[in-house]
Curated annotation (Swiss-Prot):
GO CC terms, sorted: ribonucleoprotein complex; ribosome
Alphabetized UniProt keyword annotations: Ribonucleoprotein, Ribosomal protein, RNA-binding, rRNA-binding
Annotated TM spans: none
Gene: rplT
Gene Ontology annotations of biological process type: ribosomal large subunit assembly; translation
Keyword DNA damage: no
Entry-linked InterPro entries: Ribosomal_bL20, RIBOSOMAL_L20_CS, Ribosomal_protein_bL20_C
Protein name in UniProt: Large ribosomal subunit protein bL20
GO molecular function, one term: rRNA binding
Lineage top rank: taxon: Bacteria
Protein backbone atom coordinates (compact mmCIF):
# COMPACT_ATOMS: atom_id res chain seq x y z
CA UNK A 1 0.00 0.00 0.00
CA UNK A 2 1.24 3.45 -0.86
CA UNK A 3 1.79 5.88 2.02
CA UNK A 4 0.60 9.43 1.60
CA UNK A 5 1.99 12.11 3.88
CA UNK A 6 -0.63 14.83 3.58
CA UNK A 7 -1.85 14.54 7.19
CA UNK A 8 1.65 14.68 8.69
CA UNK A 9 2.81 17.49 6.45
CA UNK A 10 -0.33 19.51 7.20
CA UNK A 11 0.21 19.02 10.93
CA UNK A 12 3.84 20.06 10.62
CA UNK A 13 2.98 23.16 8.62
CA UNK A 14 0.12 24.03 10.95
CA UNK A 15 2.51 23.91 13.93
CA UNK A 16 4.77 26.60 12.44
CA UNK A 17 1.90 28.74 11.13
CA UNK A 18 0.28 28.62 14.57
CA UNK A 19 3.56 29.60 16.25
CA UNK A 20 3.99 32.50 13.80
CA UNK A 21 0.49 33.82 14.42
CA UNK A 22 0.64 37.56 14.94
CA UNK A 23 3.82 38.06 12.92
CA UNK A 24 3.44 40.83 10.36
CA UNK A 25 3.17 40.36 6.62
CA UNK A 26 3.65 37.08 4.81
CA UNK A 27 5.76 35.73 7.68
CA UNK A 28 2.59 34.88 9.58
CA UNK A 29 0.94 33.16 6.60
CA UNK A 30 3.56 31.40 4.46
CA UNK A 31 5.02 28.17 5.77
CA UNK A 32 8.63 28.62 4.64
CA UNK A 33 8.85 32.17 5.99
CA UNK A 34 7.01 31.24 9.17
CA UNK A 35 9.44 28.40 9.83
CA UNK A 36 12.46 30.65 9.32
CA UNK A 37 11.01 33.34 11.56
CA UNK A 38 10.12 30.75 14.21
CA UNK A 39 13.76 29.71 14.52
CA UNK A 40 14.98 33.30 14.35
CA UNK A 41 12.54 34.26 17.09
CA UNK A 42 13.99 31.51 19.25
CA UNK A 43 17.46 32.98 18.78
CA UNK A 44 16.21 36.47 19.59
CA UNK A 45 14.45 35.31 22.75
CA UNK A 46 17.55 33.41 23.91
CA UNK A 47 19.76 36.44 23.33
CA UNK A 48 17.15 38.69 24.94
CA UNK A 49 17.21 36.65 28.13
CA UNK A 50 20.97 37.17 28.31
CA UNK A 51 20.76 40.89 27.48
CA UNK A 52 18.09 41.45 30.12
CA UNK A 53 20.61 40.64 32.85
CA UNK A 54 23.06 43.21 31.45
CA UNK A 55 20.36 45.84 31.04
CA UNK A 56 19.14 45.49 34.62
CA UNK A 57 22.66 45.70 36.02
CA UNK A 58 23.24 48.89 33.99
CA UNK A 59 19.96 50.33 35.30
CA UNK A 60 20.91 49.54 38.92
CA UNK A 61 24.33 51.14 38.51
CA UNK A 62 22.80 54.27 36.93
CA UNK A 63 20.33 54.63 39.80
CA UNK A 64 23.02 54.11 42.44
CA UNK A 65 25.30 56.62 40.72
CA UNK A 66 22.56 59.27 40.57
CA UNK A 67 21.66 58.82 44.24
CA UNK A 68 25.32 58.75 45.33
CA UNK A 69 26.17 61.91 43.41
CA UNK A 70 23.28 63.67 45.16
CA UNK A 71 25.18 62.88 48.38
CA UNK A 72 28.50 64.11 46.98
CA UNK A 73 30.05 60.73 46.20
CA UNK A 74 30.75 59.00 42.90
CA UNK A 75 29.57 55.46 42.19
CA UNK A 76 33.04 53.93 42.17
CA UNK A 77 33.94 55.69 45.42
CA UNK A 78 30.75 54.41 47.04
CA UNK A 79 31.40 50.80 46.00
CA UNK A 80 35.06 51.03 47.04
CA UNK A 81 34.11 52.52 50.41
CA UNK A 82 31.55 49.78 51.05
CA UNK A 83 34.13 47.12 50.18
CA UNK A 84 36.64 48.70 52.61
CA UNK A 85 33.95 48.69 55.32
CA UNK A 86 33.21 44.99 54.59
CA UNK A 87 29.59 45.79 53.75
CA UNK A 88 28.21 42.96 51.64
CA UNK A 89 25.25 44.37 49.72
CA UNK A 90 24.58 43.82 46.05
CA UNK A 91 23.79 46.45 43.45
CA UNK A 92 20.16 45.42 43.12
CA UNK A 93 19.51 46.02 46.81
CA UNK A 94 21.45 49.30 46.78
CA UNK A 95 19.35 50.44 43.82
CA UNK A 96 16.11 49.51 45.61
CA UNK A 97 17.25 51.46 48.67
CA UNK A 98 18.20 54.47 46.54
CA UNK A 99 14.76 54.56 44.94
CA UNK A 100 12.44 53.49 47.77
CA UNK A 101 14.33 54.33 50.98
CA UNK A 102 16.66 57.32 50.51
CA UNK A 103 17.39 57.57 54.25
CA UNK A 104 18.59 53.98 54.36
CA UNK A 105 20.73 54.60 51.29
CA UNK A 106 22.24 57.69 52.94
CA UNK A 107 23.38 55.51 55.85
CA UNK A 108 25.31 53.34 53.42
CA UNK A 109 26.79 56.46 51.82
CA UNK A 110 27.93 57.69 55.25
CA UNK A 111 29.51 54.29 56.00
CA UNK A 112 31.38 54.46 52.67
CA UNK A 113 32.55 58.03 53.36
CA UNK A 114 33.85 57.05 56.81
CA UNK A 115 35.73 54.02 55.52
CA UNK A 116 37.26 56.07 52.68
CA UNK A 117 38.38 58.73 55.17
CA UNK A 118 39.93 56.08 57.43
CA UNK A 119 41.79 54.45 54.54
CA UNK A 120 43.38 57.78 53.56
CA UNK A 121 44.81 58.36 57.06
Amino acid sequence: MRIKRSVTSHKKKKKYIKAAKGYSGAVGRRYSLAKQQYYKSGKYSYAGRKNKKRDYRNLWITRINAAARAQGLKYNELIHGLKLANVDINRKMLSELAVNDPDGFNEYVNIAKQSLAESVQ
